[in-house]
Amino acid sequence: MDLSFTKMHGTGNDYIYINCFKEKFTVEDAIKYSPILSHRHYSIGADGIILIMPSDKADVQMRMFNYDGSESEMCGNGIRCVAKYAYDRGISKNNPMKIETLRGILEAELFLKDEEVDTVEISMSSPILEGLKIPTTIDKTPIINEPIIFNDKTYYFTAVSMGNPHAVIFVNDLHNMDISSIGSYMENNSIFPNRTNVEFVEIINRGEVKQRTWERGSGETLACGTGASAVCVAGFISGRTDNIILNHLLGGDLILRYENDNVFMKGEARYCFEGTITL
C-alpha cells in the first residue's frame, strides 16, 4: 500500500499528517505503523502520527498517536498544524475553525500571511485540577508542590490535565537536568494510572519561562502544546507566574494566556515536506 503524507511541525513538535479525506488509513493502521514510520533512522521520522479526518460535529477531526503507537487525547502543537493544513488545502475555510479531538471540540483562530495560515491561537479549554480526574491516585484539589523522591532527591510537582495528564516540575537549572531518567520515572510512576507527561520549567521572570518536555510515549521532544498550557496554569495557581507568559521551548516560542478558566495558546505551524511511502 502506498501512503501519501505531509510532515509538519509546531515549534519543533513534528508529526506525520495523514489526510484521511483522501487516504484509506485507519486508527488501527496508525497504532500499527506509528512506531515504524516515526523512527528517525529507518523511516520518515517524527514524534508520532496525526490523522486528519471528517467530523459530523466540527469542521475537521484529529486523532493523535505517539511514537510508541499509543493514542493521546490531544496535542496542542499538532492541532495548530491540523488547522493550517485544513485551511490551506481547502478542507475548511472557516475562521475560527472548530476541530474535534478526544478532549472535545476546540476552536482555532487563524492568522494569515499571503493567504496561508501563519500562526494559530487555540482555545485549549479548561484545565482539570481535581487529582482523581487528572488522573492521579492523590485525592486532592489542586495538587501543588507535591513531593516525590527520585534517587534520594526530592522534586515537587504540580499536576494539571489539559485533556491529558501533566506533572509540572519547577527547577533552578534546566540545562543540567537529567530529563531522561527523571522523566521516565515520573511518566511510569504508579501515582499516574494512565502515565503522565512531564514538564521541567525554569522561571526567568513572572511573564517568561523556559521549558523542557518529556512526553508520555515519546520521550523528550522539542515542544508540547498541552504541556506549555499546563505550565501556564501551574505557574499561575502556584503563585510563580502571571496569567500570561512567553514560553521558550527547545523548538521555539509559544504565548500562553490563562483567563476565565480557559487557556489560550498561540504559535506557528509549519510544513516540512510531503511524500509517499510504501507500507
Swiss-Prot record:
The entry marks the following residues as binding substrate, namely N13, N66, G76, N77, N164, N197, E215, R216, G225, T226
Group of enzyme by EC? isomerase
Provide the E.C. number(s) assigned to this enzyme.
5.1.1.7
**What Gene Ontology cellular component terms go with this record?**
cytosol
Q: A biological process (GO) annotation for this entry?
A: lysine biosynthetic process via diaminopimelate
The record's family statement is: Belongs to the diaminopimelate epimerase family.
Q: What is this protein called?
A: Diaminopimelate epimerase
> Per the UniProt entry, what species is this protein from, by scientific name?
Brachyspira hyodysenteriae (strain ATCC 49526 / WA1)
Could you tell me the gene encoding this protein? dapF
